[in-house]
Amino acid sequence: MEVIMRIYAHRGNSSVYPENTMISFRSAVELGADGIETDIHLTKDGVLVITHDEEISRVSDGTGMVKDMTYVELQKFDFGLWKDEKFKGEKIPTLDNLLDLLEGTEMVLNIEIKMGFVLYPGIEEKLLDTIKSRGFMDRVIFSSFNHYSLARLKGLDMSAKVAPLYEEGIFEPYHYARTFGADYIHPYYKSVEQSIIEECHKQGIGVNLWTVNDKETAEYLKSIGADAVITDYPEVLIKSIRS
């Protein structure tokens, strides 16, 4: 039986469009990606917004920390211009904006909770409230490099699907994942081998890998049983993997 490996668009179709913007997410939907991976922060006034960094200067014409600004203040900045003049006018999206886009699809949403340099007290509760109220619990994966945040999510609701992100190798990650009830592992793709994927599957744990940007690597990972790859080039991998 052929292995079906899913393609998740990393911050949308981010190789072509400004990352984590609605134009990037719309492109991923139009391409037929199986899912979207994105990053969540909390504003000063408690709004769940989408951007990768804690500080906005890399991807906007503004400066400052997300945590120190209200949503209205963040709306003053342009989040498309850094990529190209033709994307001028893109604003920072909210989680609700993205959920609105995905509502009529069956796409998976992988939400990375940014809880590294900045801690957002209560972000787990706010995320669960939003995802539940919008009816997305069955197709959201919560991931984070802060595994305490994932354990907290599981403590709040065991039905939440969580996935620890990691870059360096973890010894027997399938056992580690079980310590807080993880449903998936999300390692850097060079940190896994076939035996790890096979053991994860035996224990009912999915393996989704980041960030895979060439079709040769994607084909290899498919051959060893990866469940999904997260990519900046969804169009390239969709054509390769599904051909």
What are these regions (language model features)?
Residues 1-243:
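Phosphate-group recognition and catalysis centered on beta-loop-alpha active-site segments
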